[in-house]
Amino acid sequence: MKLIAANRKLFENIKIKYCIIAIFSSAFLAFGLYQVHSFSGVTEGGVLGMTLLLQHWFNISPAISGFVMNSICYLSGWKLLGREFMVYSLISTLGFSGSYRFFEQFEPLWPQLYEMPLLAAIVGAVFVGIGAGLCVRIGGAPSGDDALAMSISKLIHKEIQWVYLFTDLVVLGLSVSYIPLQRLGYSLLTVVLSGQIVGVLQRKKC
């Protein structure tokens, strides 16, 4: 009986509407990361950028590396962010990993984006900003850097987009190992734009 009561308490405030948003927004994010960032040479920061770095150097699918790194970040911050956050984040993470695995089966739709890094940076930022932003807005996170950014933002009382910028810059620094220097400027543009979009969406209510 105690176990049943605990499960009811865990899910009593969970909204079906938010679960649906978590699934579709994480799929939107996965589509953009695969179709734009993984083929354009314009990377993301945070855990998303780390998944691309691991894919490049060790051929580890972001569907796997993303799930592992996200789980570590979530377990580190669940006490601060609460039970509802964990439920929505689990749905978002599974949605992202499953969607990315599905999209990996197909050829890129826009391979020409490699020759248009500015457009890739802008389009990629829209996919990442909206996908991650909608998840953050409902109180969840599709990736570990979102969970980490939400935790740090709450602790230091700073707007989330500036926390994103700091963590993204760290990953971009590591990405110098496989991304040409001239493309890092476009990567910086995409992380700044996506972070601002997340910040705007976070302030809105569903």
Language-model-detected regions and their locations in the chain:
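Core subunits and conserved enzymes of cellular information-processing
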Residues: 2-206
